[in-house]
């Protein structure tokens, strides 16, 4: 009896996504010991040793603040505060609001997953909680589809990447590419490296042991290395600080973005054709993945990226099979980024001005499409065992890119409108803290494991009541991290980047 085409496709997709080699128990022990030794070589094993370099750095920041004419003056807290409070007064200020909404949505997503002990421990009550969230007539889809906050970030990232590249688009390609990537690395790497150092070591284990057990215990040396090399979205499973996968995706998309942007700048029609074709191809690949793995009824990928207790390799594989590949790889996730890239190109190349009525019409229609896309997941919640129906397959393939187009439409309506309306300065400040809030919000979410109100929650309303407290604590932590880590290091790296001609 011959195998079905579906079986062949599934086998091919499994082979492409992961090749598993047999290893003896002795080999596994040796690999574990090697990984442990390599990890300990870079991360101290006591809180005192791990905190010493951090305290030394903070001391230098304080010295730079108190002695403004010293060699450490570039680390000054006063300078960092001034930078944080500086207003840009640009038509792109509207992006700050979208960025803030996106991080709140991501926080909401994680509060409703990693914030719950029953989900972390895979207890029976976790399924009841998830059903209660999905079944809510108003907020069910908003909660279940909250991972769409990532698509907002991808649109913004693509838009800003395009504007950054096109400012010097006439420079020699490879010279410009190296400078473009170096600047992005200098933007993302320092804060992320220091956060991983704290999160993967004894400091976080002492403060939040449950975070360490579910987020870090499965890391080993290679898991940590994947984060500092921006390849964590290519891990076989997202069990090592899985929520940081976005940084790897962002860097990889930045690395290939100049190919599209160079073509858009020199041959606009060809560039448009290549970009649109790639977006469509990404949708087709998404449909292929969900069809092959039978996961088209799980479009929202509503599972936490953690290390579950007592799991073996096969259980782990079954939990994330297909979903992780579809959710994190550049070829399945590039659509929203490329849509933002096109919008960024249009904002640079076009001087078009919208009259007020056109701007309002575009914004409102785009908002309606965005809301409709969010709530179009409801048939999956109403029929959770429907499987790979045509509706589920098409929705899984296109909904992230359609949502990205709707977000881009709203941004375009605000950017090209005739009248300029400045946004509230508070959004500019919050937007500057968003990157650190993204890094730090997950440990904050774990603090709420001790909140009985959240653990007993049975409605999305309960999550919405907790969200402001998660956001406030996350942004307070982000402010401290910004003042002592991101801004001072940014001042140093910008000086060296200027000297190197980047």
Curated annotation (Swiss-Prot):
Q: What induces its synthesis? A: Induced by hypoxia.
Biological process annotations from GO: negative regulation of cellular response to hypoxia; response to hypoxia
Look up what happens after changing residue 157 to F. In ia38; loss of inhibition of hif-1 activity
Q: Give the knockout phenotype.
A: Impaired acute acceleration of locomotion speed upon rapid increase in oxygen levels (from 0% to 5-20% oxygen). In double mutants for both rhy-1 and hif-1, normal increase in locomotion speed is restored.
Q: Name one Pfam family in it.
A: Acyl_transf_3
- Membrane topology, from the record: Multi-pass membrane protein
| Record's subcellular location | Endoplasmic reticulum membrane
Sorted alphabetically, the keyword list is:
Endoplasmic reticulum, Membrane, Transmembrane, Transmembrane helix
Where in the body, by tissue, does this protein show up?
Expressed in intestine, some sensory neurons in the head, body wall muscles and socket cells.
Q: Name one GO cellular component term.
A: perinuclear region of cytoplasm
Where does the protein principally reside?
endoplasmic reticulum
Q: Where are the transmembrane segments?
A: 54-74, 92-112, 138-158, 188-208, 241-261, 272-292, 335-355, 367-387, 396-416, 437-457, 465-485
- GO MF annotation: an example: acyltransferase activity, transferring groups other than amino-acyl groups
Q: Which InterPro entries match?
A: Acyl_transf_3_dom, O2_lipid_transport_reg
Q: Which superkingdom heads the taxonomic lineage of this protein's source?
A: Eukaryota
Q: What does this protein do?
A: Involved in the response to variation in environmental oxygen levels by inhibiting hif-1-mediated gene transcription in a vhl-1-independent manner. Plays a role in susceptibility to killing mediated by P.aeruginosa and by pore-forming toxins produced by B.thuringiensis. Probably by preventing hif-1 transcriptional activity, regulates behavioral responses, such as locomotion speed following acute reoxygenation. Plays a role in normal egg-laying probably by regulating spermatogenesis and in body morphogenesis.
What is the name attached to this protein's record? Answer: Regulator of hypoxia-inducible factor 1
Q: Which organism is it from?
A: Caenorhabditis elegans
Q: What is the lineage of its organism?
A: Eukaryota, Metazoa, Ecdysozoa, Nematoda, Chromadorea
Q: What gene is it encoded by?
A: rhy-1
């Amino acid at each position: 009896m011959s195998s079905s085409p579906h079986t062949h496709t599934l086998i091919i997709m499994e082979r492409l996504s992961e090749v598993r080699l047999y290893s003896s128990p002795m080999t596994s022990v040796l690999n574990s010991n090697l990984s442990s030794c390599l990890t300990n070589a870079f991360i101290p094993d006591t809180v005192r040793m791990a905190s010493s370099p951090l305290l030394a750095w903070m001391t230098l920041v304080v010295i730079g603040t108190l002695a403004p004419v010293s060699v450490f003056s570039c680390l000054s807290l006063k300078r960092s505060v001034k930078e944080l409070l500086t207003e840009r007064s640009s038509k792109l200020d509207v992006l700050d609001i979208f960025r803030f909404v996106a991080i709140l949505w991501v926080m909401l997503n994680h509060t409703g997953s990693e914030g719950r002990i029953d989900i972390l421990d895979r207890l029976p009550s976790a399924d009841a909680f998830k059903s209660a969230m999905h079944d809510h007539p108003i907020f069910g889809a908003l909660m279940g589809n909250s991972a769409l906050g990532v698509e907002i970030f991808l649109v913004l990232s693509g838009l800003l990447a395009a504007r950054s590249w096109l400012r010097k688009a006439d420079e020699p390609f490879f010279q410009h590419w190296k400078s473009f990537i170096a600047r992005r690395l200098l933007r993302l790497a320092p804060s992320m490296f220091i956060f991983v150092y704290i999160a993967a070591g004894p400091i976080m284990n002492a403060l939040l042991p449950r975070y360490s057990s579910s987020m870090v215990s499965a890391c080993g040396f290679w898991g940590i290395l994947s984060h500092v090399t921006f390849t964590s979205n290519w891990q076989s499973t997202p069990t090592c600080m899985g929520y940081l996968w976005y940084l790897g995706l962002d860097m990889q998309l930045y690395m290939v973005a100049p190919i599209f942007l160079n073509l858009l700048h020199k041959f606009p029609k060809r560039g448009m054709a290549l970009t649109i074709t790639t977006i469509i191809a990404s949708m087709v690949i998404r449909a292929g993945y969900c069809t092959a793995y039978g996961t088209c009824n799980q479009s929202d990928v509503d599972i936490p990226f953690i290390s579950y207790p007592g799991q073996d390799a096969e259980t782990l594989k079954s939990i994330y099979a297909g979903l992780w590949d579809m959710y994190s790889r550049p070829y399945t996730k590039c659509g929203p980024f490329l849509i933002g890239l096109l919008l960024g190109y249009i904002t640079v190349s076009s001087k078009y001005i919208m009259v007020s009525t056109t701007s309002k019409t575009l914004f409102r229609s785009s908002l309606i499409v965005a809301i409709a896309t969010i709530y179009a997941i409801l048939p999956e919640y109403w029929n959770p065992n429907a499987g790979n129906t045509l509706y589920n397959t098409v929705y899984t393939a296109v909904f992230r890119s359609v949502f990205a187009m709707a977000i881009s439409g709203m941004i375009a309506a605000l950017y090209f409108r005739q009248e300029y309306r400045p946004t509230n300065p508070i959004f500019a400040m919050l937007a500057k803290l968003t990157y650190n809030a993204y890094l730090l919000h997950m440990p904050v979410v774990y603090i709420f494991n001790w909140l009985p109100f959240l653990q007993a929650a049975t409605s999305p309303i309960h999550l919405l009541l907790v969200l402001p407290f998660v956001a406030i604590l996350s942004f307070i932590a982000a402010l401290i991290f910004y003042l002592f880590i991101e801004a001072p290091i940014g001042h140093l790296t910008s000086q060296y980047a200027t000297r190197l001609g980047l």
